[in-house]
Every structure is written in structure tokens, then in C-alpha cells.
């Protein structure tokens, strides 16, 4: 078979991706025979990069995937996980039917999982929800979902939970990974999400990675960074982390810093900029304002924890006070080169070189960060601090210059943040605490005034605590695996799930750790078994069509949400005051009120697409995905969140919002790029009425838990290239599982020697919360400094999150998975 140049490049890219993971691909797989295969586009199911792939189907199955050569994001490339996308749906243990714990023919908390019908499943769910609402009110009924559900599913969830069941206890697992970034974006700019785009990679002169192993977690973007670095010797890469990983292989300046000390480093950089007269005064005076944050704000622990009791400003953690440049200068002034070195352990010459990069007006610079930055008990502060240095120098909203928060899930932006599936949010950056925002939603959704509660519900970690304490009694977990992925499993998560007062539902395609701990498992369609839409890290919205059917009785998350709404009549969940405003809703179901409202149900299924599949539209009798999207899109149009029309996204490889007059926006807030910035304004941060971004003064504060005499090591957790999050999908791909079958604990050889341990030894990692048996690695891809160990959480056989501390950022509620105290002994 002859290969074109494009085919040859794609084939070699596949081999390179496999080699990075230690996988040898059979020669026949490099350019497989595609006769009889139908190809269509879809965004990748894994990280937030938003790669587009071509999905090959034959005889009702996905048989192959390949990088989409027409996609701007990945340009025909796949990482190793993307290469094996075709296998994620075909694990031998797919859940085929709803499974309810039963004993003697009825539900029993300690019963065995027994097949039931969808009607039986929804009936007992509705019974539990109605009883809980009657006894304790809306916030005792919760949903925990993710940035992996589609935009349509997220929007349907928000409507059912916040409007239908009148509960704001709905949160995504993005609370564990992106909440601090989102909160800091909103506080700094008045709007969420990055102002730049991936085009910055090819236009910048320098990259600084803060707590981000892009080589393994965002490998396609890393390939673009590598190409930029290797094509121009003037381009520099700085990689900053608490341990050495694969991204260090490209670093011109590799920096290892002590956990939590990024706060001190960033304040030093701000101080350096000021002391060396490198402030861009024209930009700062025109486009910024100064605020001061509260200090001593606690650690998001239970109120009775000594650290919480000792903190002075727990209740005002998020408060910002008007300030000035002079006050900001005083806040950062103590962070000298000497002090930053003392706190961080970073050599002075490296700190100074880093500060000079940010300060040099001729140096274009992009800052990238992910979980090492966000999963932090001062995550909001540290996000503010990175914005501070970009704002002080004016290196923002400009090609090749900007702060860029990367996401870890395919639609953490599109579904969790933009749609508003957080406890406090509504679509398009609106919030439940703002009466005007609530009024806008109630009017658009044709609801009685006062339907949507105005107080946030229980966020992720609080959901676990409230389940344990008996204040949250119904939880529906969808498209995530918190029993493995959440913090402090033994003490805070498992007790609540098995609390006999509570009823736990898990929608999942596989029997995950969460699923087997639940009371009811609902079999769920995956990826291209449904029509969907994702929003990636650069504000790019991407659509795909359903391409195959799900197995047996599997149903999409969208179908489950909307169908479940049929089990509630308005008067069963709304009070008489609401019913009196709209008596015509009496006797109607939430399905009729929320989804047969003349908006969601007004589009017919297309008849001009050969082989078109849409199981949800077939069941409901209308094009529900289009109806949901067009209703949702109205909230952002004209307000800086403009989305294109539905059909456009099916034709394109995604568009970056705001999309105005058919044109996407690459750089927000900048004249000439953003249609919301008028001629002559240069920059305008229009999330705030005055168009100014906030520079926030906050100090370094110590972490919630540090090593001591007994627990003498830092423990940090994260991921590896081959597996994604809790491994529910990737561990069912034989090639990925074989390449990295089990979790390891990485340790410095000197630390191992002190403990009488050697590479490969079976060890026990112990913290104040739990212990885990694993094997030691002192030679592998991750090289820890003395005093720190690193492990991953993909392995259901080890459950690393038995070890982690459930401390959170007090402002965002995001969990700090990156630092707690541990000890290691031979097992």
C-alpha cells in the first residue's frame, strides 16, 4: 500500500506517541486497512486540550481513531491515549442494565446488586428525592458530576437541579481541579477563562510552566512547545515543579521548589519588577486597579479542626479591600531574593533569571499551569499572583503574551464553567447569589419568581462531609469516580456513602470504585455513543454526532436527566407560593416545564444526514441537543460569551468564543482582536464596568500540613502519561494497562537508603488518614528531591486518596492533593 506524505507523518506520530509510553505497535496498525470504515470527527474524550480525532466505525462499532489533519489544535497528531480511543468503550465489564442493591425482592442498603428496569430505578430515585425534599429541603438532594459530560448534559442538569428540584447542591469534579483558576479569573477580570489561545505557543519567546507536566498531561500542546523551542534558540523554557518529571527534558531552566513556596516566588517576582522600575505604568494606570486580600483565612477543613479554629478570617476569606499601588508595594516588599530563596530552596541565580524574564519588556512570555498550581490551599491567591506579574508588565491579551490556565478534562470549561454546573453558578458567568442573574434565568426558563435558590449548596468536599453527617441524603454521581478520585476516602467519603440514611446513585459505563460503593448503578453511554459538545481550554466549542449505539440498556447522561424529570410533578417539589404564580403548571411534570417549554422542543431531527443517529431525539421526539444549546446560548450572546449557531459547530473543527458575526476571538480584551473592545481603548477588561483588571496583594502563608518528626516526607499525588484520572477507561485498554499496570511510589535514592529501602521494594506509605501498599521507584521517569515522594491515583488496587488531606482553598473550595505529610516503611 502506498502512503501519502500526510499518512506517513501520521503513522510516524503514532509510533512516537507509543514509544513515549513504552508501547510497541504492530506494523499493521500503523496504516491499517480502512476499507468499509466510515469516518467522522469528534473531540478527544480525554484531557482539556481539545484535540480533534477522526473516528472510524464499521458494523456498529468504533474500530479505529486517528488524529484529525484538519484540526487546528492537534494538526493530525494524537497522544498515546488518543491513539487508543477506539478501545475505551469495549471493556468486557461494561454495565449492561440498571443494578439496584436488593434483598428479599426490595431495596436494601446491604443487599446484592440486582438487575432492574429503568422505570424501577427511576421510581426508587424519585421516592428518595421526594422524601428528602419534604424532610430537609433542596440542598439535601445533591448531584456530583464532571467536566466530562457534554454541554447539553450540563445545561439539562442545571435546569433540573436548580430550577426543577430547587437545589444548588450540584457540583462538578472540576471543583477538585479548576475551581481556584475559575474563581481567580472571575475576581481578577470579572469573567472566567483564559484571554489567550494556543496560537500564543507559536508567537511567544518564552514559556514558564508552574506545576504542570505538559509532556505527559498535555502532550499535544507540549509537541507544539517543543517545536517552537527547537526551531528558535532564542526561545526559552522554564519548568517549575516540586519534583523532576518528563517536561524537564526540554527545560533551559529547570527549577525545583519546596511545596507551597510558589507564593513566595511570585511575590518576589512582583517585588523585583517594582524595585527595578519595570512596571508598565501606561498599562497599569489605564487598565488596572489594586485590591488587598484578607489573610489568615484557614484551610477549608471542618470547623472543629484546630487550624480552622485558630484562623482569624475564615468567614471573610474571599473579601477584597480597595487598595493602592503603594500598599501593594509594601505587601510584596518583604519578598526579597534572599527571602524567596530561603522559603523556596531555589538557587538565587535561578530566581533572579526568572524574575528578569517576566520583567524584560522585550521578552514575550506565556505562563502555563495546571494542578500543581490549582490544587493548593492558597490556589486562588497563587492564581492572582500570576495575573499580578502579567498585569504589572502588560504582558497579557497579546499574541505570545499571557497567563494560561490549562484544564484537565475535555469540557471542564464548556460544561462545568460556562454552563454553570457549580453550586454557585448559572450559565455565562452568572451566579445564584445575584438577584438580577437569577431573574434572567427564571424569565428565560419561564419559572415562577423565587424558584431558583439564592444561596450556594454543598460543594464537592462539603458533599462528602454532609453525607457523613446526615445532612445530605441523596446523591447522584455522574461521569466521575469520587470514591477513588476524592480526598481522604476512609475518613470523609466512604462513611457517607454507606450511611444507612443516604441513597447513592452512580451513572457509569463501568463498575468503578464509586459504582460498587453505591446503592444504584445506571449503565451509561460513552463518548460517540451519543451526540455531544465539549468546550476546551482555549474557549473552543466543538460538536460531534452520535456514531454508534451504546450496549444493551445503556443510556446517555442526557437521556437519564431528562427522562428522570418525568417522575416529578411541579406541586410535588414546589411550594404553594410558587404554584400560585403559575397555576397552569399544576399537574405538569418537570419534564414538561423544563424541556417541553416551547424552546428546547422546537427543533426537529435532521432528515438530510445519511446514517444519522440520535437515540435521545428518537425517544423524546424532537432535536433535544439543538434545543438545549440554542436556549443556553442566548445567555451569552451580547454579553461577551457569544456562541455561534448550532449547525456551524457541526461543520467546523470548533470555534473560540466570543463568536461575533461568524468570527471567533483569539485574544480577548484587546483592541483589534476582541469585538467588545472599541477603537481607541487598546485594552478593556469588560468583565468589570470600569474595564479594569484587579492586582491583588496577598502574602505567603504556610501549608495546612508539613512534614514533622513522625511523618517526615512531603507526599504529592498526580498522574502519568498512560492513564487518565482514576483509570476507569485507560486501564481497560490492554496496551495502556500493560505499559503501566500498577501505581508506584517515587522517592529519592538517598531517602530510600536512609530507610533501608531499595528500588522495587514493596513499601507502605502512611499518613494520619490512611495507608497504602505499593512498590518503590528510585530510578524512573519522576525524580523526587530529598524529602518528597510522589504517587499517582489511577490504580483502583491501591487508592492513593486514602492518604490525602481534605484541606481546601477557603475561597474556591478546591482540594490540595499536592501536599501532606507521610512516612514510608518496608511492607
UniProtKB/Swiss-Prot annotation:
Q: Which PROSITE patterns match?
A: 4FE4S_MOW_BIS_MGD, MOLYBDOPTERIN_PROK_1, TAT
BP GO annotations: cellular respiration; Mo-molybdopterin cofactor biosynthetic process; nitrate assimilation
Pfam families, alphabetically? Answer: Molybdop_Fe4S4 (PF04879), Molybdopterin (PF00384), Molydop_binding (PF01568), TAT_signal (PF10518)
The listed locations are: Periplasm
Task: Tell me where in this chain the 4Fe-4S Mo/W bis-MGD-type domain is found.
Answer: 37-93
Q: Which SMART domains match?
A: Molybdop_Fe4S4
Residues binding [4Fe-4S] cluster are 44, 47, 51, 79
Sorted alphabetically, the keyword list is: 4Fe-4S, Electron transport, Iron, Iron-sulfur, Metal-binding, Molybdenum, Nitrate assimilation, Oxidoreductase, Periplasm, Signal, Transport
Entries under SUPFAM superfamilies matching the protein: ADC-like (SSF50692), Formate dehydrogenase/DMSO reductase, domains 1-3 (SSF53706)
Q: Which domain of life is it from?
A: Bacteria
- One Gene Ontology term, aspect cellular component: membrane
What are the GO MF terms of this UniProt record? 4 iron, 4 sulfur cluster binding; electron transfer activity; iron ion binding; molybdenum ion binding; molybdopterin cofactor binding; nitrate reductase (cytochrome) activity
Q: How is it modified after translation?
A: Predicted to be exported by the Tat system. The position of the signal peptide cleavage has not been experimentally proven.
Q: What is its main location?
A: periplasm
* UniProt cross-references to CDD domains, sorted A to Z: MopB_CT_Nitrate-R-NapA-like, MopB_Nitrate-R-NapA-like
Under catalytic activity, the entry for this protein gives: 2 Fe(II)-[cytochrome] + nitrate + 2 H(+) = 2 Fe(III)-[cytochrome] + nitrite + H2O
Cofactor remark from the record: Binds 1 [4Fe-4S] cluster. Binds 1 molybdenum-bis(molybdopterin guanine dinucleotide) (Mo-bis-MGD) cofactor per subunit.
Q: Which cofactor does it need?
A: [4Fe-4S] cluster; Mo-bis(molybdopterin guanine dinucleotide)
The residues the entry assigns to the signal sequence are 1-32
Q: Which PANTHER family match?
A: PERIPLASMIC NITRATE REDUCTASE, RESPIRATORY NITRATE REDUCTASE
General function of this protein = Catalytic subunit of the periplasmic nitrate reductase complex NapAB. Receives electrons from NapB and catalyzes the reduction of nitrate to nitrite.
Subunit and interaction comment: Component of the periplasmic nitrate reductase NapAB complex composed of NapA and NapB.
Similarity comment text for this entry: Belongs to the prokaryotic molybdopterin-containing oxidoreductase family. NasA/NapA/NarB subfamily.
Can you name this protein?
Answer: Periplasmic nitrate reductase
Give the species: Haemophilus ducreyi (strain 35000HP / ATCC 700724)
